[in-house]
Amino acid sequence: MIDTQALRAEQRLRASEVIRQDDFLVVPPAFIAGADVGFEQEGAVTRAAIAILRYPSLELVEYQVARVATTMPYIPGFLSFREYPALLAAWEQLHQKPDLVLVDGHGISHPRRLGVASHFGLLVNVPTIGVAKKRLCGKFAPLDEATDALAPLEDKGEQLGWVWRSKARCNPLFISTGHRVGADSALAWVQRCMAGYRLPEPTRWADAIASRRPAFQRWLQQHPEVSQ
């Protein structure tokens, strides 16, 4: 039996520790990572992939994939507790630690202000940004269908981040502070990491690596020097 009251209390405590302004050790970041989490074997295994890209070229220089036994069932609002063990395992495998991590998921744009990007950022003490594909909480004004349509994401009078249409006629991204990155900087860094797709390159690569997509398989054959 999962004690959700205890988890809520932990979320609120950790959320109070999140740094919501820029606190970079390396400016500009020399290496930017993307992190993506998924599940295998009907949820029994949690898989995390982290892709390390050199900035500003956005070339992939390292990737790591970790698989761990899933220790918590799916409970809405508590997904970070289910995902972070695999993220930590992948993080420990990295040879080159990044200066900034874009996480496929929410940062402070969470009912208790602790999505996986914030939770993971606190655990490894690295600047993180949440780049989510769906809204978890908050409201925003309707967006134009054009590329770069933008609106603040707000909840209870607080701006949690940005809703940004990165590509015309595609669903928008929900961008928020994870840890040690301000809201405006979070948006700016995601925009700097775009290369014509809906997703920024770091999380696009992490997703491709985690899913072993054909495009990644072809790329890997051409770049055997990239380390795992």
UniProtKB/Swiss-Prot annotation:
Q: Which HAMAP family match?
A: Endonuclease_5 (MF_00801)
Q: What is the official name of this protein in its record?
A: Endonuclease V
Q: Which cofactor does it need?
A: Mg(2+)
Instruction: Report the protein's function.
Output: DNA repair enzyme involved in the repair of deaminated bases. Selectively cleaves double-stranded DNA at the second phosphodiester bond 3' to a deoxyinosine leaving behind the intact lesion on the nicked DNA.
Q: Which family does it belong to?
A: Belongs to the endonuclease V family.
Q: What is catalyzed by this enzyme?
A: Endonucleolytic cleavage at apurinic or apyrimidinic sites to products with a 5'-phosphate
Residues that hold Mg(2+) according to the record? D36, D104
- Please tell me one Gene Ontology term that the record gives under cellular component: cytoplasm
* CDD domains for this protein: Endonuclease_V
**Per its UniProt entry, which superkingdom is the organism in?**
Bacteria
Documented EC number(s):
3.1.21.7
Q: What molecular function terms (GO) are annotated for this protein? A: deoxyribonuclease V activity; magnesium ion binding; RNA endonuclease activity, producing 5'-phosphomonoesters; single-stranded RNA binding
One Gene Ontology BP term is: DNA repair
List localization entries. Cytoplasm
Membrane spanning residue stretches: none
